[in-house]
From Swiss-Prot:
Has strong antibacterial activity against the Gram-positive bacteria M.luteus, S.aureus, B.megaterium, A.viridans and E.faecalis, and against the Gram-negative bacterium K.pneumoniae. Has less potent antibacterial activity against the Gram-negative bacteria E.coli DH5alpha, S.typhimurium, P.aeruginosa, E.aerogenes and N.gonorrhoeae. Has moderate hemolytic activity against sheep erythrocytes. This is Halocyntin. One of its GO terms (biological process) is defense response to Gram-positive bacterium. It comes from Halocynthia papillosa. Keywords: Antibiotic, Antimicrobial, Cytolysis, Hemolysis.
Length: 26
């Protein structure tokens, strides 16, 4: 159960980080 939550959190964090990097570069 917690593994699924942790994976979701990591996925959202990675997406947010990627979005921030993409926004900074563009």
């Amino acid at each position: 159960f917690w593994g699924h939550i942790w994976n979701a959190v990591k996925r959202v964090g990675a997406n947010a980080l990627h979005g921030a990097v993409t926004g900074a570069l563009s």
